């Protein structure tokens, strides 16, 4: 079972009913991130896609259900990390979620990919700077 299949299965019945059959393997490799972090990254990324782009694992949701499903997947991912006592990852993904919202609200959706790359890197054995560090100089309002 792929991480995206697991994400669909972990959703409530209303959202899971919109899951695509046989979703792709996903973006995040369990061999690189570990099973829990890979599941969480996939869940949170799918939540992001439901809010801002085309989801990979779900189809046929109306606009309201897309937003609710996206929020539910954010919560699912963060809750799974909290159950695993992975507070570093909870903090990183909380930053990522809010910074992606900031990037889209400020008209810079292209920055979201940088944020995702930074978060995926810091949550892998390679480590590195996280999402907040990657945009630290750009958080001030532009005039």
What kind of region is each of these model predictions?
Residues 1-143:
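All-alpha prenyltransferase/terpene-synthase fold signal
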């Amino acid at each position: 079972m792929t991480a995206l299949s697991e994400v669909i299965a972990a959703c409530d019945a209303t959202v899971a009913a919109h899951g695509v059959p046989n979703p792709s393997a996903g973006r995040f490799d369990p061999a690189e991130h570990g099973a829990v972090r890979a599941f969480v990254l996939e869940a949170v990324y799918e939540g992001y896609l439901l809010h801002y782009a085309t989801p990979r694992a779900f189809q046929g949701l109306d606009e309201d259900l897309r937003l609710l499903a996206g929020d539910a997947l954010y919560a699912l991912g963060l809750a799974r990390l909290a159950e695993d006592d992975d507070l570093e990852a909870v903090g990183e993904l909380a930053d990522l979620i809010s910074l992606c919202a900031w990037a889209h609200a400020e008209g810079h959706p292209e920055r979201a990919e940088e944020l995702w790359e930074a978060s995926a890197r810091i949550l892998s054995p390679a480590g590195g700077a996280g999402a907040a560090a990657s945009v630290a100089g750009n958080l001030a309002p532009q005039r």
